Amino acid sequence: MSERKLFTSESVSEGHPDKIADQISDAILDAILAKDPEAHVAAETAVYTGSVHVFGEISTNAYVDINRVVRDTIAEIGYTNTEYGFSAETVGVHPSLVEQSPDIAQGVNEALEVRGNADQDPLDLIGAGDQGLMFGFAVDETEELMPLPIALSHKLVRRLAELRKSGEISYLRPDAKSQVTVEYDENDRPVRVDTVVISTQHDPEVTNEQIHQDVIDKVIKEVIPSSYLDDKTKFFINPTGRFVIGGPQGDSGLTGRKIIVDTYGGYSRHGGGAFSGKDATKVDRSASYAARYIAKNIVAADLAKKAEVQLAYAIGVAQPVSVRIDTFGTGTVAESQLEKAARQIFDLRPAGIIQMLDLKRPIYRQTSAYGHMGRTDIDLPWERLDKVDALKEAVK
């Protein structure tokens, strides 16, 4: 009998407390970048019942009304009713932002490669904002070259938000979570969905039976292709039996606590650094995007069925200290060839990544819910497939 395996990933909605924090941090980043593209930003957010704290380090000459940005973001998510215990107009907003450390700034603003050498390449000027390792990944399981479990998990909670905001399911509230377990065959190909878990916040009057039926009919069956569902697929809808108290009233939230949701759902490794609230000189963010860009173009070029790219940096140094590509035995060329090609085709210095992906723009708020990778609903530069031909040519 052939061996089959299960793999599970989860996602959370824009109304989840940690995601509220991520969206506020990225909304602040975007507001600053819109006025000052050269700004350095590290904005952290904590949310809980009736209160938002924004703290961190910023270097900019621009003025941004933090209070207004916070309230507008909360309102856009859907927290506009005081019954939710967290409302855009009544929440207390407490900003505490200071200037970036000059010790860090000197390494970012003048990389090791250019110190004492005025003739260096200007793209060597910016050093990495910190040491660290970052991963990017792609696999040919979906059209967007993402693992199927996380792709479906994101689509489920996004569908819930659409139904809530349109009023089609009027009893839905903003907080929600999804989890999808996919069965893989002996060739590591997805063959069916084994389990779907959805927990969604709701008004107190609605029955569990109504929620169960609506979620199956209007969410699950609208999102998951019927070819993946069968009579053995298990559905757990609000398995606690009640989810009225949610959002920051039910649980505190912090920026950067959903890094696996933000990336590949645990299917690929993660370097540990969060994204939201950070400008592109922070390689936690920009190099993760670059690594995804490389991996996606490798798979799209049919040079591997799956590819994981690791980049690593030293603080204040422009060039990465290592580039590693793993194709898990699915590659059509040697991994060393792919690593050499990646270094040739993709400029992996922080300033090179920023230029290559045009990262000084206010594009980050839209990434802060429903995943930073594999998005088909928005145009993100690291999702483009414009390096396929160059990669094919480089490994001939």
From Swiss-Prot:
EC number: 2.5.1.6
Source domain of life: Bacteria
Note describing how the cofactor binds: Binds 2 divalent ions per subunit.
UniProtKB keywords: ATP-binding, Cytoplasm, Magnesium, Metal-binding, Nucleotide-binding, One-carbon metabolism, Potassium, Transferase
Single GO cellular component term: cytoplasm
Residues that hold L-methionine according to the record: 57, 100, 251, 282
Substrates-to-products reaction catalysed: L-methionine + ATP + H2O = S-adenosyl-L-methionine + phosphate + diphosphate
Gene Ontology molecular function terms on file: ATP binding; magnesium ion binding; methionine adenosyltransferase activity
EC category name: transferase
Residues engaged in binding ATP: 16, 175-177, 242-243, 251, 257-258, 274, 278
PROSITE patterns in the cross-refs: ADOMET_SYNTHASE_1, ADOMET_SYNTHASE_2
InterPro entries: ADOMET_SYNTHASE_CS (IPR022631), S-AdoMet_synt_C (IPR022630), S-AdoMet_synt_central (IPR022629), S-AdoMet_synt_N (IPR022628), S-AdoMet_synthetase (IPR002133), S-AdoMet_synthetase_sfam (IPR022636)
Pathway assigned in UniProt: Amino-acid biosynthesis; S-adenosyl-L-methionine biosynthesis; S-adenosyl-L-methionine from L-methionine: step 1/1
Binding site for K(+): 44
Residue sites binding Mg(2+) per the record: 18
Cofactor needs: Mg(2+); K(+)
Protein's GO biological process: one-carbon metabolic process; S-adenosylmethionine biosynthetic process
Matching NCBIfam families: metK (TIGR01034)
Assembly description: Homotetramer; dimer of dimers.
Family to which this protein belongs: Belongs to the AdoMet synthase family.
Task of the protein: Catalyzes the formation of S-adenosylmethionine (AdoMet) from methionine and ATP. The overall synthetic reaction is composed of two sequential steps, AdoMet formation and the subsequent tripolyphosphate hydrolysis which occurs prior to release of AdoMet from the enzyme.
Name recorded for this polypeptide: S-adenosylmethionine synthase
Source species: Streptococcus pneumoniae (strain 70585)
